[in-house]
């Protein structure tokens, strides 16, 4: 049985596909959170899904039990779903894919995504991801990425040469290799998230990816509630950093580097005395947030 299931075979106009995957390409969970927000924001309806049975080890990615609105207990399985938003004011419709990087049979899974792209006659495919980087939390979220399509690269300010990275890759890398081999228009776009702040969710990162997604498809981004959440998050981060000398010193170092470099480094910078590990900084930051949530009387 084919693991790709269509609830409705949509007739679409030159659709743009925005894809997000949880896992390797989802630092701080911002990409998939942005994908889910876009589904609601654009009132997209599910049109297809991939059966998880072949692709996940349920010991590692366990299904979740919950109660629905009718008070009935349900089991929710790991999902890779596609949602359609028809846009009569644009020249193209929009498909949003929100899923989880599979554990097994990556080539088979990639083949199913490619089958979906071809059956829906997708005009352009964009993956929205997030990676950990040594960037200032207070600066606007920096995006990196590339496209093999010169027009897409020019429109979005992306590299045309692609990344020179060599080493382990994720589903996003595998999928873009398949798209390139089929000569299909695509772009890979990454939000650079500060590795020393591992708090989830990260409203500032989610807002940035949502804005980028709306920019790609040509829609306005009027998001006052998300903007307020992002400002509040930055305030809480600043308070946390002020409480910890090691994190504060690291941020000061980043501020000095920002004055000397135009692009963020994606490897930890040395502190004044010794390198401070990302795990150490993240642990200190998380401890501060837990104390803030408990309140002073419980500390």
Feature roles, as predicted:
Residues 92, 100-152, 175:
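Internal, conserved structured core segments that host functional sites
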Residues 134-216, 220:
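Catalytic cores of processing enzymes, dominated by hydrolases/peptidases
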Residues 197-299:
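A conserved C-terminal secondary-structure "cap"
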Residues 26-33, 104, 108, 112, ...:
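Conserved active-site and cofactor/substrate-binding residues in soluble primary-metabolism enzymes
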